[in-house]
Swiss-Prot record:
GO terms for biological process: proteolysis. This is Probable M18 family aminopeptidase 1. The lineage of its organism: Bacteria, Thermotogati, Thermotogota, Thermotogae, Thermotogales. InterPro entries: M18_aminopeptidase_1, Peptidase_M18, Peptidase_M18_dom2. PANTHER family: ASPARTYL AMINOPEPTIDASE, M18 FAMILY AMINOPEPTIDASE 1-RELATED. Keywords: Aminopeptidase, Hydrolase, Metal-binding, Metalloprotease, Protease, Zinc. GO terms for molecular function: aminopeptidase activity; metallopeptidase activity; zinc ion binding. Its EC number is 3.4.11.-. It comes from Thermotoga maritima (strain ATCC 43589 / DSM 3109 / JCM 10099 / NBRC 100826 / MSB8). Zn(2+) binds at residues 93, 168, 426.
Amino acid sequence: MKMERKNVWHHRKKEEIEAFSKEYMEFMSKAKTERMTVKEIKRILDESGFVPLEDFAGDPMNMTVYAVNRGKAIAAFRVVDDLKRGLNLVVAHIDSPRLDFKPNPLIEDEQIALFKTHYYGGIKKYHWLSIPLEIHGVLFKNDGTEIEIHIGDKPEDPVFTIPDLLPHLDKEDAKISEKFKGENLMLIAGTIPLSGEEKEAVKTNVLKILNEMYGITEEDFVSGEIEVVPAFSPREVGMDRSLIGAYGQDDRICAYTALRALLSANPEKSIGVIFFDKEEIGSDGNTGAKARFYLKALRQILKMQGAKDSEFVLDEVLENTSVISGDVCAAVNPPYKDVHDLHNAPKLGYGVALVKYTGARGKYSTNDAHAEFVARVRKVLNEQGVIWQVATLGKVDQGGGGTIAKFFAERGSDVIDMGPALLGMHSPFEISSKADLFETYVAYRSLMEKL
C-alpha cells in the first residue's frame, strides 16, 4: 500500500555501477564546454557506426544518423520504422554555468594583466574566487581561420584564478549581491612587463605570449568565444567512493547517460537524443531548445521516407513522440534540508528522480506532465525494475527553475523531466551519486525501448 524508497546499492551489482562510473568520469574530463562536449559525443557516435545525416545513403527505415548544429548542439537518431509513428526521445542540455571572456577582455591595472569576464547562467559569484581556473574556446581570425585555445588542462600548463580579498581587510558587512560584483570577476593573466615597452607593458607581454602560441592579436578576441571553467578533474568523493565530484554535471550527466542508452537500447520504435546549448540562459538563440535545427533533421528523414508534405507530417510525428527531458534536480543537503518538502524531495543513492513539474511560484513557466503520461512512464519503470523516486524543486514559493521540457510540450509531444539528483548544483564542483548515475542510464534505456 505504501510507496517505499529503495537504495540502489542494495539492488544493483557494485561492479556494474563502478565500471559505468569510470567511463562517465573519463567523458567528463574531456567534455568541459558545450563545443568540447559535442566533439566528444560526435567521436563516440562515429565509432559506433553513426553517420552524418547529409551523408546517409541507405535504407531510410533503418538509419543511425546524427546532425551537428554549429558545433554547440547535436541530435542523433536510430530510425527503425516509419517516423510517423513518432519517436522515444531523451533530450538534455550540454551548457553549464561558467565565466565568458568579454569581447575586449585584456586590461592592465596596477601592473597586473587581467582578463575581464561576464558570467553565464546562474552562479554564486563567490564560488569562483581563489580556485584554479582553465580556459577553453575558439577564436576566428580576420581571414576566417579557426584557432582553438586550451590553457590549464594539462599538468604542465599554467592555470588562472580570481583572487579573493583577504579576511583581514574584509570587515564590511554587506549583502552577498553587493559584496561580490560580476564586474570584479577578472582572471590574473600575468605580471611580467615586456622589456622596452613603456605603456601597458604587462598587457603587451601577455599579448606577445598569445601571439607566439596561437598567432592571434588583441582584435581577434572580438570574434572569439573563450570560456572559463574550473581546473578540476572529476574525482571520487567520500571514504566509500560512492559519489562523483565534477564541474558541469548539470546537465552533462544526463547527456552521457542518454547517449549510452541510445547506443545500447533494443528499440521497437525509432529513438533519439538531442543535446542543446543555451539552457542555462533561457534556451534562446539558434543552438538552444527553442531553435528548429532538430525539426529540420526530422523533416529530412521524413523526405527520405517518402513523405509528400513533411511539414504537415512533422506535426503528426511530434504528437506521437514521447520525450524524457533529462535534467538534474536538487538532492537533499543535510545542513540545508529546510528548503525542501522532504516528502517530495530526492535523496542521493535512491535512483533516478521523476519530476512532474518545475517552474516557480504557482507553477509558472513549466511543463506539468499529464497524469496519463506519468502513468505510462511509471509503468515502464516498474516493469523494467528501475529504481526511481519523486522530486520537486524545493518547498512551494522557496524558489524555482525550469528545463527544456516545455519547449517540446509546446510542439505537441508528451514530456516529463527525469534525471539524477545533485548536491551543490551550479557550483564548480557538483556532486552526484554513482548509483543514481547508473540508474539514470537504466531508466533512459528502458524508456527508449518500451515507452
